[in-house]
């Protein structure tokens, strides 16, 4: 109801203000625009106190509120102060004040741009303003007492009510400001905190305490050491050892000290047995590794080249399809002297009658390309190296026997076009390398060329020598 009564009062005041403005517009000077003299102005600049048209109202808005404050006569709501300003000034007094220095033959502009320039010169720059009129108006206002704006009692009562309402509002604001510092803020906050604590305490007491659950150890790495159960002299290992696949040597070593059993039996033998078991488990890999290393060293020492200079013999069977039979060949530890005395290039060297060269149809003597320093084969240009007769002896000691009277592998004889593997193996069995007597020369038939002889002493040359 209060809001409705306030609305009714405001509506009545607005109607009264409209009546006052309509009376002011009926005056002769107020019927035309104060700036462009257009008929029927419906807008007003209440701080200046003039009535203007809608076009000039837009220009006044562009000037800014510090210069001109525009209101509509019909659409906006007016206050008593604004109405008072309009009654005090009006278009007649405004022209006398702002157009005092205007030229006599001055023609008012009609275009928008020209009107804007004129309004700015008139109100913003105060180009035509009368400074003496300000002093006159100030003196007259100070000497003459203030007269009521409107003789009607209703308007005067409305103005008085507005003043009373404003005074009441000011008093209320002052009372509120006085009450604010008196109210203590800290005790309230302390009381609120205490209430919150009291509300939270019963909640905490009602909630049951959860027992601390032990963490589940999936791998059994962090579990505590379980003491072994002793029954007399026998010991039972803990259950964690059965679950641990890798044993105590990787990630879960057994503790050095064992917890004493629950009973009063002595735990010294149990600890001793556990220590021995753990040490035995730990030594499994170390013993195996050391044994394997020793065996490998022994095999390497046997298979090394230095062991080939010994006198032991190893029999080895020949594989089928290979032309070399079981041999019994020792390796000489000293270089033969026959190769040091080889002649130079281009010197014919006599060959023994039973050589491979005779088998292939070569002459008894052949050319040796280069001197051979401590080697068994000549240069690649010589073809086949001639060998002495002792290599081919009647015993059939080497491949050189192919040139013997039997001519097992000789190509000139047509009676034996094919090679017999069995005969080859039988005659290759007597091949050996002598290590006792060095040869005297290549041309001597009684001595071997590269230290070859029919003696069977020494170690057999096997396929392991070339691995």
Curated annotation (Swiss-Prot):
PROSITE patterns xrefs: ARFGAP (PS50115)
Disordered, as annotated region: 145-224, 408-467
First-listed, main subcellular location of the protein, grouped into a coarse class: membrane
Keyword Transferase appears in the UniProt entry: no
Membrane topology classification: Peripheral membrane protein
Tissue distribution of the protein: Detected in bone marrow, adrenal gland, trachea, lymph node, spinal cord, peripheral blood leukocytes, thyroid and stomach.
MF (Gene Ontology): clathrin binding; GTPase activator activity; zinc ion binding
Keywords: Cell membrane, GTPase activation, Membrane, Metal-binding, Zinc, Zinc-finger
Motif position, Interaction with clathrin heavy chains: 218-222
Domain of life: Eukaryota
Location within or outside the cell: Cell membrane
Biased composition (Basic and acidic residues): 160-185, 192-204
Function: GTPase activating protein that acts on ARF6. Plays a role in clathrin-dependent endocytosis. May play a role in erythropoiesis.
PANTHER family: FI20236P1, STROMAL MEMBRANE-ASSOCIATED PROTEIN 1
Protein name, per record: Stromal membrane-associated protein 1
Protein source organism: Homo sapiens (Human)
Gene coding for it: SMAP1
């Amino acid at each position: 109801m209060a809001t409705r009564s306030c609305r009714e009062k405001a509506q009545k005041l607005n109607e009264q203000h409209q009546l006052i403005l309509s009376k002011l517009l009926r005056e002769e000077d107020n019927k035309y625009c104060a700036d462009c003299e257009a008929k029927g102005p419906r807008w007003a600049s209440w701080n200046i106190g003039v009535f203007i048209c809608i076009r000039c109202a837009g220009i006044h808005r562009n000037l800014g509120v510090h210069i001109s404050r525009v209101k509509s006569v019909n659409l906006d709501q007016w206050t008593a102060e604004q109405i008072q300003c309009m009654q005090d000034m009006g278009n007649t007094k405004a022209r006398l004040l702002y157009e005092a220095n205007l030229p006599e033959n001055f023609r008012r502009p009609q275009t928008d741009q020209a009107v804007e320039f004129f309004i700015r010169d008139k109100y913003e720059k105060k180009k035509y303003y009368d400074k003496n009129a300000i002093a006159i108006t100030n003196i007259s206002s100070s000497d003459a007492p203030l007269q009521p704006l409107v003789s009607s009692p209703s308007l005067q009562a409305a103005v008085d009510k507005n003043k009373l309402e404003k005074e009441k509002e000011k008093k209320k604001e002052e009372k509120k400001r006085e009450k604010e510092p008196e109210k203590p803020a800290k005790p309230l906050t302390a009381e609120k905190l205490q209430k919150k604590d009291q509300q939270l305490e019963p909640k905490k007491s009602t909630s049951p305490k959860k027992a601390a659950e032990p963490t589940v150890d999936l791998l059994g790495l962090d579990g505590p050491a379980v003491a072994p159960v002793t029954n007399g002299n026998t010991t039972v290992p803990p259950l964690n050892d059965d679950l641990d696949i890798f044993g105590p040597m990787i990630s879960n070593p057994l503790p050095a000290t064992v917890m004493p059993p629950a009973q009063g039996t002595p735990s010294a033998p149990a600890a001793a047995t556990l220590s021995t078991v753990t040490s035995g488990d730990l030594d499994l890999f170390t013993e195996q590794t050391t044994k394997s290393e020793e065996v490998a060293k022994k095999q390497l020492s046997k298979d090394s080249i230095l062991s080939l200079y010994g006198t032991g013999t190893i029999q080895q069977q020949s594989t089928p399809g290979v032309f070399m039979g079981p041999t019994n060949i020792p390796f000489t530890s000293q270089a033969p002297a026959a190769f040091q005395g080889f002649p130079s290039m281009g010197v014919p060297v006599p060959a023994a009658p039973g050589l491979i060269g005779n088998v292939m149809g070569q002459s008894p003597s052949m050319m040796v390309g280069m001197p051979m320093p401590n080697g068994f084969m000549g240069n690649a240009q010589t073809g086949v190296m001639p060998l002495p007769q002792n290599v081919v002896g009647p015993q059939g000691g080497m491949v050189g026997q192919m040139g013997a009277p039997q001519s097992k592998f000789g190509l000139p004889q047509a009676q034996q076009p094919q090679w017999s593997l069995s005969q080859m193996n039988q005659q290759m069995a007597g091949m050996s390398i002598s290590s006792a007597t060095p040869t005297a020369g290549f041309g001597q038939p009684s001595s071997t060329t590269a230290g070859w002889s029919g003696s069977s002493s020494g170690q057999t040359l096997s396929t392991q020598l070339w691995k």
